[in-house]
């Protein structure tokens, strides 16, 4: 009951924030990144790739945000900012003239409607492991929540090992697969998991 009320509160906040700031996500090409691990790294990699290509881009992670070239310590460190702050950042980026936004998206952010109203052009899934079950109850529920981002996006980017479990929910969707086994390469980032992050980016 309490959880349902919290969800309703966050949804109402998201609706009001979108209206107040004029649905700023519609003015941006938004790339959402979700997963259990590697969200912040992959979000940052995509941001740096687009920035290096001369594209006007901002990003928001659970650690910090870079909006219109200025860095902000969000202080969230766990989940997405509340909808009000999220929409405010999107509006600042759009008003600055940025064309792209890279957004780290947590399962709590999805289930609590914090990213409601944002039209995702691309949804990226890094990986899904057995975490956050205290909130989601079961792995199936957790995985399904993560897939919400990909099902809402125009293009879904997902690893081959997760695609089989997600195939039904992504039916009819444009899907881009990545597989570190088929694309061997070297990176200065340590750990095999960072190879997955690079491929996802």
What do these predicted regions represent?
Residues 1-32, 41-55, 179-186, 193-195:
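Short, basic phosphate-binding NTP loop
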Residues 27-28, 95-99, 120-200:
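Acidic, Mg2+-coordinating active-site environments of NTP-dependent enzymes
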Residues 12-17, 81-84, 103-108, 138-141, ...:
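Short gly/ser/thr-rich secondary-structure transition/capping motifs
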Residues 54-68, 106:
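Short beta-strand-centered segment that lines the nucleotide-binding/catalytic pocket of NTP-utilizing
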Residues 33, 60, 86, 104, ...:
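Residue-level signal for inorganic ion chemistry
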Residues 108-116:
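Conserved helix/coil segment N-terminal to the catalytic DExD/H
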Residues 43-47, 90, 201:
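A generic structural signal for short, well-ordered alpha-helical segments in conserved domains
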Residues 72-106:
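Conserved nucleotide-sensing/catalytic segment adjacent to the nucleotide-binding pocket
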């Amino acid at each position: 009951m309490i959880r349902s009320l919290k969800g309703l509160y966050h949804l109402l906040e998201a609706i009001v924030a979108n209206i107040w700031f004029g649905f700023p996500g519609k003015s941006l090409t938004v790339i959402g990144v979700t997963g259990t691990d590697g969200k912040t790294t992959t979000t940052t990699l995509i941001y740096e790739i687009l920035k290096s290509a001369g594209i006007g881009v901002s990003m928001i992670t659970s650690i910090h945000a870079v909006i219109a070239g200025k860095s902000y310590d969000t202080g969230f460190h766990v989940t997405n900012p509340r909808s009000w702050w999220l929409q405010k950042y999107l509006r600042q980026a759009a008003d600055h003239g940025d064309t792209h936004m890279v957004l780290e998206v947590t399962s709590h952010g999805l289930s609590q409607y914090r990213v409601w109203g944002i039209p995702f052009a691309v949804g990226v899934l890094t990986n899904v492991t057995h975490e956050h079950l205290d909130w989601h109850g079961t792995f199936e529920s957790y995985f399904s929540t993560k897939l919400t981002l990909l099902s809402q996006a125009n293009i879904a980017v997902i690893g081959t090992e997760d695609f089989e479990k997600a195939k039904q929910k992504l039916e009819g969707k444009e899907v881009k697969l990545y597989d570190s086994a088929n694309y061997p390469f070297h990176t200065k980032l340590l750990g095999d998991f960072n190879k997955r992050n690079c491929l996802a980016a």
